[in-house]
């Protein structure tokens, strides 16, 4: 198939990056080397794929959902030994055979699957992470990145920002206007780099699970004070004890609690409940 004859499908949320400066920027921040095994999600017509393959990398494995693009991509890159292609849905495809080989993940994420993609590649609290990614580069919806980077006290702060910041170091590289895509989306995007935190000595899986439990309970009623949300799992006596031992005011709302305070709350809550 000739790429000029291909028409994008709305159901796949296809907005292809055409801004050459941003394509080059992605390659630049990836800091590629001869040992890199790249996973590219949704290569589209291969604009970014081509740039990545022209770098000193070991392998690029691309996963594309749209069957009509498979032949186009194979025709374009079939003679490149570093390239492999798999047709499938990234939300359900089995990556076990290559997961431990992948060093970097790069994707222009369809807005409608941002949450599940973050769960798969950044991870979830309390779930053992079965990967060794050095760097994850996502082009994603700007307002989601705004939420992810929010600190305590911000109206955007929430369970998502705390989870993502506990699991990775995050850096926004730049914002990307709709005109950088074809067709243009209705909103701005942001180019962001996640570096998974592999060995956070403060946390273990059981503590992560408890932090996640506290976050779910608290942010389900984010307008309420902690005292009035955690009373579903703690008695008034336990709440007072936890407030004192953690040095956290329970008259605050969850978005006003720092990450270190959530860790301390979970640690002391576990002690109280033993």
Curated annotation (Swiss-Prot):
Enzyme Commission no: 2.1.1.182
Pfam families attached to this UniProt entry: RrnaAD
Catalytic reactions of this protein: adenosine(1518)/adenosine(1519) in 16S rRNA + 4 S-adenosyl-L-methionine = N(6)-dimethyladenosine(1518)/N(6)-dimethyladenosine(1519) in 16S rRNA + 4 S-adenosyl-L-homocysteine + 4 H(+)
Location of this chain's protein in the cell: Cytoplasm
Main location: cytoplasm
InterPro entries: KsgA/Erm (IPR001737), rRNA_Ade_diMease-like_C (IPR023165), rRNA_Ade_Mease_Trfase_CS (IPR020596), rRNA_Ade_methylase_Trfase_N (IPR020598), rRNA_adenine_dimethylase (IPR011530), SAM-dependent_MTases_sf (IPR029063)
Binding of S-adenosyl-L-methionine, residues: 15, 17, 42, 64, 89, 108
GO molecular function terms noted in the UniProt entry: 16S rRNA (adenine(1518)-N(6)/adenine(1519)-N(6))-dimethyltransferase activity; RNA binding
Keywords: Cytoplasm, Methyltransferase, RNA-binding, rRNA processing, S-adenosyl-L-methionine, Transferase
Cellular component, GO annotation: cytosol
Disulphide bonds in the chain: none
CDD domains linked: AdoMet_MTases
Similarity comment: family membership: Belongs to the class I-like SAM-binding methyltransferase superfamily. rRNA adenine N(6)-methyltransferase family. RsmA subfamily.
Function field: Specifically dimethylates two adjacent adenosines (A1518 and A1519) in the loop of a conserved hairpin near the 3'-end of 16S rRNA in the 30S particle. May play a critical role in biogenesis of 30S subunits.
Protein name: Ribosomal RNA small subunit methyltransferase A
Species for this entry: Prochlorococcus marinus (strain MIT 9301)
Lineage: Bacteria, Bacillati, Cyanobacteriota, Cyanophyceae, Synechococcales
């Amino acid at each position: 198939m000739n790429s000029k004859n291909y028409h994008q499908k709305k159901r796949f949320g296809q907005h292809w990056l055409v801004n050459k400066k941003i394509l080059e920027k992605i390659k630049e921040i990836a800091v590629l080397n001869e040992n890199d095994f790249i996973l590219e999600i949704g290569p589209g017509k291969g604009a970014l794929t081509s740039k990545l393959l022209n770098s000193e990398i070991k392998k690029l494995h691309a996963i594309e959902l749209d069957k009509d693009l498979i032949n186009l991509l194979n025709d374009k890159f079939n003679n490149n030994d570093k390239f492999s292609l798999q047709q499938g849905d990234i939300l359900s495809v089995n990556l076990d055979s290559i997961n431990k080989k992948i060093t970097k993940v790069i994707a222009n994420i369809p807005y409608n699957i941002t949450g599940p993609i973050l769960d798969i590649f950044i991870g979830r609290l309390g779930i053992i992470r079965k990967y060794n990614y050095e760097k994850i580069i996502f082009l994603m919806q700007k307002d989601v990145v705004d939420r992810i980077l929010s600190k305590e006290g911000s109206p955007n702060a929430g369970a998502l920002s705390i989870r993502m910041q506990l699991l990775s170091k995050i850096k926004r590289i730049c914002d990307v206007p709709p005109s950088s895509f074809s067709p243009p989306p209705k909103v701005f995007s942001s180019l962001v780099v996640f570096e998974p935190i592999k060995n956070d000595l403060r946390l273990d899986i059981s503590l992560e699970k408890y932090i996640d439990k506290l976050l779910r309970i608290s942010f389900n009623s984010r307008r309420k004070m902690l005292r009035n949300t955690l009373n579903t799992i703690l008695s008034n006596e336990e709440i007072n004890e936890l407030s004192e031992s953690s040095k956290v005011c329970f008259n605050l709302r969850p978005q006003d609690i720092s990450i270190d305070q959530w860790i301390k709350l979970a640690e002391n809550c576990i002690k109280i409940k033993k």
